Amino acid sequence: MAEKTQKSVKIAPGAVVCVESEIRGDVTIGPRTVIHPKARIIAEAGPIVIGEGNLIEEQALIINAHPDNITPDAEDSEPKPMIIGTNNVFEVGCYSQAMKMGDNNVIESKAYVGRNVILTSGCIIGACCNLNTFEVIPENTVIYGADCLRRVQTERPQPQTLQLDFLMKILPNYHHLKKTMKGSSTPVKN
């Protein structure tokens, strides 16, 4: 099974993916994305496409799972891809099933985002917030506190460029990395 799993994981050049992370199913990881040890990305109901410059921290779980009311062997249930945009941050211990996510979003520690939520861009889901509604979260929305209160911020969260650069230098010193795919369309410089 591990043999089959490895073949369907595509890691773009420039991404840093620690061997201790768990990646199962058809997963595509974009360039400049950093995946910490113990992060889990599981594509069982369809592929997961992760864009450029995302940060996925320890114990974060990104899962494209079958909805509770649909059995995996139902013939009419075709795979639905989970699309994650660019410059998103998945903090320690968060759980995301959101099928569509834009750019510059932050899912903070221990937050839960359900399958029927669509995050646009610039959203922050606060620590321990549980979001499991059928809705599209408007741009630049902040969801915070025990009651999951909402407000709109004036600007998007800044991309974690400096943190990504730092992690790209430091993580290879302390962890083994998964091999990246050599891009057929773009030349790779080592």
From Swiss-Prot:
GO process annotations (BP): mitotic spindle organization
Protein known as: Dynactin subunit 6
Matching InterPro entries: DCTN6, Trimer_LpxA-like_sf
Role played: Part of the dynactin complex that activates the molecular motor dynein for ultra-processive transport along microtubules.
Family the entry assigns: Belongs to the dynactin subunits 5/6 family. Dynactin subunit 6 subfamily.
Gene Ontology CC: centrosome; cytoplasm; dynactin complex; kinetochore
Organism, as annotated: Sus scrofa
Post-translational modification: Phosphorylation at Thr-186 by CDK1 during mitotic prometaphase creates a binding site for PLK1 that facilitates its recruitment to kinetochores.
Subunit structure: Subunit of dynactin, a multiprotein complex part of a tripartite complex with dynein and a adapter, such as BICDL1, BICD2 or HOOK3. The dynactin complex is built around ACTR1A/ACTB filament and consists of an actin-related filament composed of a shoulder domain, a pointed end and a barbed end. Its length is defined by its flexible shoulder domain. The soulder is composed of 2 DCTN1 subunits, 4 DCTN2 and 2 DCTN3. The 4 DCNT2 (via N-terminus) bind the ACTR1A filament and act as molecular rulers to determine the length. The pointed end is important for binding dynein-dynactin cargo adapters.
PANTHER family hit by this protein: DYNACTIN 6, DYNACTIN SUBUNIT 6
Highest taxon in the source lineage: Eukaryota
GO molecular function, one term: dynein complex binding
Keyword annotations from UniProtKB, A to Z: Centromere, Chromosome, Cytoplasm, Cytoskeleton, Kinetochore, Phosphoprotein
CDD domains referenced in this protein's UniProt entry, alphabetically: LbH_Dynactin_6
Compartment annotation: Cytoplasm, Cytoskeleton; Chromosome, Centromere, Kinetochore
Residues recorded as bearing Phosphothreonine in the entry: 186
